[in-house]
Structure formats: C-alpha cells, structure tokens
Amino acid sequence: YKRQVVTLDEDDNIRQFIPGSKFSYKKKTEYFKTVNIYKFSREFSRTHYVPFLTAYSKALGNNEYYEQVLRVIALLDKPEIKALRLGGEAWYEIDDIQDLDIAASIFTPDREEHLRLMESRYGGYWRYPRIRDFCYLVNPYFPNKRLMSELKANFERLVREYPSGMRVNSLLAAKYFGISQEYICIGNGAAELIKALMSRLEGKMGVIYPTFEEYPNRVKPDMVVPFHTASRNFTYTADDLMEFFSGKDIGTLLLVNPGNPSGFFLPKGDVLRLCLWTKTRGIRLIVDESFVDFSCGMPDNTLLKDGILEEYPHLAVVKSISKSYGVPGLRLGILASADRELAAWIKKDVSIWNINSIAEFYMQIFGKYEQSYVRACNRFMKERDRFMQELSRVPFLNVFPSQANYFMCEVKPPMKARSLTGLLLKNHSILVKDCSRKKGFEGREFIRIAVRDATDNDALVRAMHAETGSEPSSTCPTNGESPFSSCSTSAS
C-alpha cells in the first residue's frame, strides 16, 4: 500500500492503478498490493508501454515512477493489463531500514533464527498480518464494537489534545475500579508501576516460581528467596507458603494470582490469610491480579476493595488493564494500596503525563460498557473450557488447568518445547511462548498458549496435530487473510 495498489475486475483485469495520494482506507478491501514484478510482451511494449513512457517523460520529466505510465494505460478502453493473484506466497516490499528489519525476520531460512527474531520484537505483530499471536495475553471478546466505534469517533481530537495529569487520571482509575483516589496510581502499563514499586522495596523478596519475571528481574539475584512447590502441577496453598517463608528473612512476598505462566489460582480465602500473616510479621505483600477477571467467580475474587486495602495497608495490588480488558496498545495498568506514603511516592516517581489521551478517554467511557465486559469474560470462560478439551487431545501435550487467559502445557518427548515453537511459527505462522528456559521448569519442557477466539484456537489445534500426523476432533476456517490481498501483474 505504500507505493501502489490496484483494483481488479472479475476477470482479473486491472481497472485502476491507485497512487498513494489517492489511497482510501475505506476502500482497502477492494485493493490489491502489487509486488512490483511485471512481464510485458514485445507487442505490448511496442504499441503501449514505450510510446506512453516516451510521451510521459517528455511531458513530466524522468523523475516519476514507472507505474504512473501503467496508471495512464489502464484508463484506455482495452488496456490489456492483467493481474496474477498470489496464492499465499511470502513477499515483502523493502523501501527503508524498518522494511529490511521486518523482511529479515520473515525470510531467514534458519528456523531458530526466525523464532529468535520474532521473539525479540516483544510485540508489534500487526506488521505481520498472517501471524496468529498466542504469545501475548489479551481478552479476545473485549472491547466490543460499540466501544471501539466511540474511540474511533473521537480519535482525531484525542490525537491533537494533551492528556490530563496524574491527579485527574488517578480519579478516573478510582472510578473505574471503585476505590479511593488516594489509594490508586495509574501507569503506562503495569510494567511502569512495577519498576517504580520494586525500586522502593527494602530487604529480600520471596518469589513463587515459575513466575512473571518482570518482578524478580528488577532486583539483584541474591535478594530473591525462591519458593518451588513440591507439586508437579505447580499448585500450592497458603499453608505451604507460610511454612516455607516463616524461617526466611524477607521484607516482601510476591504473589502473582492467577500464576503466570501456570494459570494456578490461589483461592481468595487463602490470599486473605496471607494478607494477615504478612501483616503480623511486617512483610510487604504484593499481589499481581492482572488475570483475576478470568477466574471462576471473578467479581468476588479481586482485592481491589477499600475495606481490604484499609485492613491491610502493607498490601499493594497490581493489575494490568491490557490483559483482561483487551487494550494492550493503550498501555494501562494500576497499583492500589492504602499505604498513602507509597502511593504518593509512586505518583511522583512516574511522569505527570504518563498515559496518552486515547488511554485516558478509554478510562473515561468504560463505565458504559461494564456489563459488556462481564459478558465478554463469561463468554471467554466457556471458550477456555472448550479449547482445553481440544488441546488435551494433542498427543504430545499435557495441558494444565487454568484460571487465566492462557494454558501452560508440558511438551512430552520426543517433542521439545523449542522445536515445537519454531515449527508452529515457520510452518503455520503461529507464535506461542516457549517457557523451557524459565526458572522453575528445570528438566521439563513447557510452552504457554494464550486463549483466543474459537477460530484461532481451532487453527492452533489443527497445526499441533499436523506436526504429529494425528487427527483433530473438529475443523474450522483456514488461515486468516492479509489486510490487503496480493498480486503480481502482467500485460499482453
């Protein structure tokens, strides 16, 4: 679309060459991107292309794209220029260093290098329209179309206006979650708040492995006291944690609940027991509940209540809005604590304009869509149950039950997690998370698979079976289409 697109008739004759200045995003489904490969017959060159090229260069000079000549020829009654539609072949147009970087990640022949280049991007996969991203974790059923339409309707003004500062946005976040404004901090994603919080902590930190490593990576390795459950299913109880950490000198205990990547959910009653236990021992408790809205009984599982925060002022609750609310591109997260000194310090530590106007507007209007969000989460849970049944039929996978929007899967011999991840990407354009190198999985092979909508989930199941020659129990539509169809052109 950057240089030239065309429109076709039912016989694949090119009707128009559309230059960039005439490109309309409203008509993008009608366009085909040219791959800049042309075959001209001698007769076409003699009767059409060379005469028009000569006249065009005399009139407008030589500093023009050759396709401008084809654009003029296409206006004739019988231009005799046909297109050949590509059938899924990989191609990429390279005009600058960004294009070169993307093309390198697409066309490298080495499977491991292909995977490494894709993983190292940490997102931005809209640049790869055929990729199905099962690596990063969002809600496939929210936001709904009406909310997205409201964002789009206000997009131009929001882009041109400054966002509010921390005070106003903390008020919005407080309204969003129904807690006091002085207890809550809003961040440019939870990652910004995690960084600020970890720099504030004193003493060693107890960490339950495997975990979301953004937390322990923010402290020195010798300041981490690791807990490894004896359960091969990576489950544990509040009693297990209290017994283990009772004899340890820690200033902070981290609980990611549901666990990432395990998906294990410690019941709220056990979490409240941990709140009391840490309070009596002067231990800061951090609970990351970014995925709690995907847990069964979700409205009652959160700790984001004024009463809970006030009873346990040593408690800090972190929540990523990106995950369960399906808006990772907006970069929103919150931290809540009745420790007013901590909350005030974090608000000063981050930038006053740490979220943009579009993210602020989303927070402003969310209340109108709260019931739609609850329905989306309930719909998600049903699809998660169905998806688990399908994944469980894959011969080389052991799927762990999950209360989050992903499954942790053990990869059984002779398959390896790394090779499976590479095969899915190279052969099926599916990206999953290779967890084989994560701490806590030593000696075992694991991947993490996001739960997406039914069409994508079934595509992944089919791809898994294709790598073993086994048969899936159900079928679904084939690979998704690129935003622009592709074609090469020829003239007779």
Predicted features by range, described:
Residues 106-161, 248-249:
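N-terminal "arm"/small-domain region of PLP-dependent enzymes with the aminotransferase-like
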Residues 2-60:
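Conserved core of the sugar-phosphate nucleotidyltransferase
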Residues 198-218:
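Conserved PLP-anchoring active-site segment centered on the Schiff-base-forming lysine
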Residues 232-298:
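Active-site phosphate-binding strand-loop segment of PLP-dependent enzymes
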Residues 32, 165, 314-400:
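PLP-dependent aminotransferase class I/II
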